[in-house]
């Protein structure tokens, strides 16, 4: 089974978050997809097979299946554009339909996804306390303008906004402890962000639940963050840029476009490159 390797949300010819992409006539058994994802070793591998009106899609991390993965969807959009020409493709997830658009902008590949609907709610205080302990942060490190939240756009994320770029750069934690915490909390990643401006955010996304210390680019988390900003009335101006992967030597750029409709899909776009 051929696995394409594509880095999504890349910055020029560098960076981005690598994803495996498998285009097949029919989806393999879940156990086989999990095995392939583990062999590939990226944070996610996406599997897609033609179905009525589009493509049936499933996402696998090395240790678990995840309901949605933004960077793998961007990689899939690029792969579909290469295989079938520029266009918009309908993707059937487990419980919703989304679209991804892929196009060639020589020499670059580009893609944009429309996320599942978004929602957010304040994070329980005990969850926040445990998360701060995991990273050796304190309440004083949190940006009071953006209270801790559970945010969703196809997957659940804990959003913690920090006041300091230096604190974000110094992020560290124990992988096994983080895995237990995220699994028990039912969250896919912890989205650690710092607002440089109202529309420019630095981000790091630990993904211990999937056996990955940190994601270089997390499209689902960017969509969830954008939905959260809309919910709290943040002056986003309709668009934010998320800079991720800088502190791990894999610079990534994600753009999220935000409408005024509460809960509406977020458009997340970026470049992609073949590996």
Please give the residue ranges for each predicted region.
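Short glycine/threonine-rich catalytic loop with a Thr-x-Gly-x-Asp
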Residues: 66-69, 212-226
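Acidic, low-complexity central loop/insert segments
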Residues: 54, 60-182, 230-274
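A short linear hydrophobic-aromatic micro-motif
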Residues: 44-47, 143-147, 189-193, 241-242
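Conserved loop-to-beta-strand segment in the C-terminal subdomain of adenylate-forming
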Residues: 13-18, 155
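Short beta-strand-to-turn element immediately C-terminal to the catalytic PLP-Schiff-base lysine
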Residues: 21-25, 48-49, 159-162, 193-195, ...
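Glycine-rich, acidic
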Residues: 150, 179-202
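Anion-binding (especially nucleotide phosphate/pyrophosphate-binding) glycine-rich loop
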Residues: 32-66, 192-201
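N-terminal, positively charged, Ser/Thr/Ala/Gly-biased leader segments
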Residues: 1-15, 140
